[in-house]
Amino acid sequence: PPEGAKVISLSTWPQYVLDNFATVAEAVADLRKEKFRVQTVVLGTGRAANMHLVISDASGDSAVFEYVDGNLVIHHGKQYRVVTNSPTYDKQLAIMEYWKEAGGRSKCLPGTSRAADRFVRTSFLLDVLPGVVSPTYISGTPQQSFKFQAPMAVLSLMRSVGTPLGFAN
């Protein structure tokens, strides 16, 4: 952003996007103009807090925003649905490509609690979640309804890639 640009805090950045844009395309177009810069906080570790901002809309359009070395980087498209804390998003995508080419997605997946491994597992699992009523699972859902199956599937995905509270690498 230009010198002297307005500053907003890291914590208000998502709210700004939610309050001002109806679609991902609108948000991307406006944020590309870099009318402000996002001010981060310094954590107790002495490092600046980093954050990816991920948005999607009713059409399925998505975008991932992140600041890398002070510069806003935007990944825009329906394929950008998963993000973890680190590394930078371009590196997360490169790791995903490695696993696609290695054939690991259908045979084995990385299993550590590292963010990059969780990114690969989440991407794989999100791709295989049923988007329609699944005869395998529907009998175990309340009212045998997809409106219950879908959130149950998402919760099971989240639990399978989450790191237990208190666990440290």
Model-identified regions with their sequence ranges:
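A contiguous strand-loop segment
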Residues: P1-A5, K33, V38
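C-terminal, well-structured catalytic/ligand-binding subdomain of enzymes
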Residues: P1-D19, M51, S56-N169
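Short, well-ordered alpha-helical packing segments
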Residues: Q15, V28-L31
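A short, structured loop/turn motif at beta-sheet edges
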Residues: L18-E26
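Surface-exposed patches in mature extracellular/periplasmic domains of secreted proteins
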Residues: V28, Q39-T45
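Secretory-pathway/luminal and periplasmic proteins that interact with or process carbohydrate-rich
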Residues: R37-V41, S62-V64
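Residues that act as N-cap/strand-start positions at coil-to-secondary-structure junctions
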Residues: R47-A49
